[in-house]
Swiss-Prot record:
The chain crosses the membrane at residues 101-121. Interacts (via N-terminus) with gM (via N-terminus). The gM-gN heterodimer forms the gCII complex. Residues 1-100 are virion surface. Belongs to the herpesviridae glycoprotein N family. It comes from Murid herpesvirus 1 (strain Smith) (MuHV-1). The lineage of its organism: Viruses, Duplodnaviria, Heunggongvirae, Peploviricota, Herviviricetes. Envelope glycoprotein necessary for proper maturation of gM and modulation of its membrane fusion activity. Also plays a critical role in virion morphogenesis. Signal peptide: none annotated. The keyword Transmembrane helix applies. This is Envelope glycoprotein N. It comes from the Viruses. GO terms for cellular component: host cell Golgi apparatus; host cell membrane; membrane; viral envelope; virion membrane. Keywords: Disulfide bond, Host Golgi apparatus, Host membrane, Membrane, Transmembrane, Transmembrane helix, Viral envelope protein, Virion.
Amino acid sequence: MACGKTESGDDSGRFGRTGAGMFGFIMPGFVGIFRLSFFLLLSFAMASGSSSPASVPVSVAASVPDTTVNKIVISDGSEAHNINEFYDVKCHSHFYGLSVSSFASIWMMVNAIVFICAFGVFMRHWCYKAFTSDTAKGY
């Protein structure tokens, strides 16, 4: 028995892994992929926006009372934008709408797809390597 393998049943010789098998390795990868795909779909839906008009229309009064002459009137930001206002300190970035067809958004989507594919290839290689090492361990 000095040269034989001790069978203690605690799976201490399995490269530090527990005896749970492949489930502990595969399942977090799938959960991560599902969460990432849900996040990307949600981001794409939010970025595409809605084409319906605002729920509360902005009305312009024909005559302005004297009490509101020097006050700032807040609008919903649906009118045309002046590009020079973008560099103004008082500019609010949420007035400028997102475009899904812009170069930056397309570049981000391509990067996300590349990272998802790379993660899938990595997980496939890692799980296959763990599967073959577990299968060949008994022989």
